[in-house]
Every structure is written in structure tokens, then in C-alpha cells.
């Protein structure tokens, strides 16, 4: 007997079936025989103990699990014959045992399906794509950054200023007790880089070489070591060295030395920097828009997620996490010690992130479906070429290492963002949006 049931609240198709009792009995007997072959009894060679005598030593749970494992592929095939195209099944199933004994087996398969999604009016979002207007100050700042990057650092004997690179020692205390990871010696820091928690670098300004001072800060709420979050801390610091940046001088000779194509004079450099700033502003606007638009849409829609999909995404995040630790040569135990996390804390974080990523992926997919956004072969080839150029690999290498489906999803998601920008941008940016839409750059 087979029964189908769609579960919209979990986006699953449940197929429940009662196994053929004769077949189940056969698999159970095979499992008994395999388990009996592992039994050792005095007077019998290993694997030669009669089943009648071996049964008393068998683990019933192990027999059931083995029988089910052997029978499962056939049962899954049987269940799959009851799936139709309109079910929109998107992944292999998980299963639950409804009833199981030596003579009977009832099992249900839960197939993840494309969820029912009712999107809000994504064509009229409160979030708008807005490009920051370029000012003369922006161009001057770009020039200054370039000159500083091409400049040199010299050691000075004066109080610390913004932009300096200092070498210093520090030791942190919470409730007047030293804490793990809060101490360092001969640490280099660019003042103004915001590498440390808020307020730390600002209090270093004005300090002098060889003199000690106390700095008071509060760890942020979302700090990576969660036991330190929102805690007040005191850092004892000592400046060892101060280096000041001596920027390069802006001349036509300097510009020519940069070897930028078609840029040989100061005026040409300014045009180049203006174009660069515009591209940066567009890219920054896209990133902000995507984040805020997805948040706005996500807050107005419920997306049911199948347990199997959540588990697969958690597994993927876990693999990436462990791969990153391995690359950085950090043992898991050491990471847990430093961060004060437990493995359950990490799993819980992965679960939250997995649900968020899956929800966003279905929002992308639903908009793509409604707007008829399908990648073309030309777009696929162009995307592969860009990846090859960016990574320094050949087109063939990219095609072999990055799956076709993954590239198609990336292109589709980009088309969705472009479409949302088309619907939700400020009037002042109409010309830039239209130009870049035509050039496929937004």
C-alpha cells in the first residue's frame, strides 16, 4: 500500500508505503545470517555457528538496521515511481520508520519540494538602489590614497597620529583579570584601519614612545568570542615604534611610472580616478541594495524549508569551516578554546545561517521564475571567461572545477539583482542604471 501526502508547512512530499511482507522477511533472514557469521562460540569455527544457536547472541537492533539498509534502495525506487513532474521534487529523500518488526515494515519517505512562496511587491520596495554622487573631495581622497600607497614609511619620535603605523605591546583585562587572546608584543597596527574594536585605535592617538597607558573599551555585542560580548575591558599598552607615511609626490613623471594604460599625465589620472570611483560607488551601491532588498523581502515572506535541505546546507557550511581551519593550521580544540564556543554553539550558528541562505536562494529562484530570467549560453560562456581571467586559470579549468549548475545559479542571481535594481532605483540614477543594464555591468 502506498499513500502520498503533500506537506506545505515543511515543503515536503511524503510517500508512505508498506513493504511486501515476504520480501521484508527475506531481507531480515539475510541480515540474521550475516550477523550470525560474526558470532564466535566454543566448538564452532568462526562463521560456522548454526543460526539457531547464534540467535541468542545477536543484537536485534543491529539485525533490523542491516536488513533495512539492504532493502532501502529497492524501497526508495518503489516510492520514486509515485513522483510526478508537477511535484517539483528537488532532492533525494530522508526516511522515517513508521512500524517495523520481523514480519512487517512501514516506512515513509520525505522528499524536499519547491516551496510555496508568496512574495511581497518586490517592484516597489522601500529600499532603493542609490549611487553616491562623486565629489572633488572623493577624487582628492583617491589621489591621496594612491600617493600614500606608493610612499614610504620613516620612523619618527613624536606622539601617535592617525595614519601612522605603530609597533606596540598590549595586555587586556576583564574585571582586572587577564583574558585569553588579549595579549600581544611587537604588534604592528595602522592607526585608522579599524582593525581593533571600536574606540581602541582612537585612544592610541597622542601616546608617546616607551610610555605606558591604559585604554578602556567595550566588546561589541556580536564579538566572535561570545563570552566577551558587551564586556568592558582595560588594555595596558606601550608604544615601541612610530612610523609615518611619506607620500609620493604627484607629478607627470610619477603618473607615467604607474604604467596605467592611456594615463600619462595628472589630468588623465584624475579622469581615470573619477571613472574608478564611479565603478566603486556602483559596486558599493549594488552590495548595499542587495543586502537591504533581500532583508526587506525576507521580512515579509515565509519560506518553508525541508529538513533534508537544511541538513545538507549545514553539512556544506561545516565542510567550509573545517577546511578554513585546516588551511590556517588551527586545530578545532584550539579554536574552541580561543572563541569559548562549544561544538553545539557552532552547529546552532550553522543552522541559522543555513536557513537564511536557503530562504534567500528560494527568493532569488521565485523572482527569476516570475520574471522569466534564464541564463543564455552566451552569458554562461562570458561568465566562465571572466572567472578564468580573474583567477588566472584557463576556461577549460574553470569549466572542469566549477559545476555548470553553480555558474547558472550565479548568473541567474545576478539577473535577479539587476531586475530589482531596474524596478527600485532613484530617479537621479536612471541614466547610469540604463547604461549599465545594457552593458550587463550592474
UniProtKB/Swiss-Prot annotation:
GO cellular component: cytoplasm
Gene3D superfamilies in the record: 3.10.50.40, Trigger factor ribosome-binding domain, Trigger factor, C-terminal domain
Enzyme class, broadest EC rank: isomerase
GO BP of this protein: cell division; protein folding; protein transport
Enzyme Commission no: 5.2.1.8
Major localization listed first in the record, in broad terms: cytoplasm
Localization in the cell: Cytoplasm
Pfam families per the UniProt record, alphabetical: FKBP_C, Trigger_C, Trigger_N
Superkingdom classification of source: Bacteria
Keywords: Cell cycle, Cell division, Chaperone, Cytoplasm, Isomerase, Rotamase
Catalytic activity entry: [protein]-peptidylproline (omega=180) = [protein]-peptidylproline (omega=0)
InterPro entries reported in the protein's UniProt record: PPIase_dom_sf, PPIase_FKBP_dom, Trig_fac, Trigger_fac_C, Trigger_fac_C_sf, Trigger_fac_ribosome-bd_bac, Trigger_fac_ribosome-bd_sf, Trigger_fact/SurA_dom_sf
Domain called PPIase FKBP-type: residue spans: 163-248
Recorded GO MF terms: peptidyl-prolyl cis-trans isomerase activity
UniProt record similarity statement: Belongs to the FKBP-type PPIase family. Tig subfamily.
NCBIfam families given in the database record: tig
Purpose of the protein: Involved in protein export. Acts as a chaperone by maintaining the newly synthesized protein in an open conformation. Functions as a peptidyl-prolyl cis-trans isomerase.
Written domain comment of the UniProt record: Consists of 3 domains; the N-terminus binds the ribosome, the middle domain has PPIase activity, while the C-terminus has intrinsic chaperone activity on its own.
Protein name according to UniProt: Trigger factor
Organism this protein belongs to: Mesomycoplasma hyopneumoniae (strain 7448) (Mycoplasma hyopneumoniae)
Organism taxonomic ancestry: Bacteria, Bacillati, Mycoplasmatota, Mycoplasmoidales, Metamycoplasmataceae
